[in-house]
């Protein structure tokens, strides 16, 4: 099955210790997921899987991708994983999603990356 991108969203770009300092990576990821799902015209329960790249994972708690997904309204039954591959995490996540869709394992996925360089 071919894989297509139906929505693309990014979070604001900030400066270290500036306006976004109070936002965790999972909170920023949730904003992007919520908007991507809305712009794609799907309901939050439609994705089969959430896979997000996230490099600076120390201190973020367990599976920040799952935290972001739940905060974005994705049901708890939808699995989520965080990938850590320095400077390539979001592309690795998108590649993983693409491979799973082309293999026929999944139909709809949320894939991308999230980061907070301040906290």
Residue ranges and their predicted role:
Residues 1-2, 15-46, 61-119:
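Acyl-thioester C-C bond-transforming condensing/cleaving domain
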Residues 9-13:
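Short polar catalytic/cofactor-binding loops
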Residues 50-53:
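Short glycine-rich or small-residue beta-strand-to-loop segments that form or flank ligand, phosphate
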């Amino acid at each position: 099955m071919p894989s297509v991108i139906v929505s693309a969203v990014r979070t604001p770009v900030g400066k270290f210790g500036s306006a976004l300092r109070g936002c965790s990576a999972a909170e920023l990821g949730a904003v992007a997921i919520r908007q991507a799902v809305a712009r794609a015209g799907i309901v939050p329960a439609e994705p089969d899987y959430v896979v997000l790249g996230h490099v600076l994972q120390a201190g973020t708690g367990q599976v920040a991708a799952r935290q972001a997904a739940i905060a974005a309204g994705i049901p708890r039954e939808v699995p989520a994983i965080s990938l850590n591959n320095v400077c390539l995490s979001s592309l690795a996540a998108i590649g993983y999603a693409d491979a799973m869709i082309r293999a026929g394992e999944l139909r709809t996925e949320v894939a991308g990356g999230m980061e907070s360089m301040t906290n």
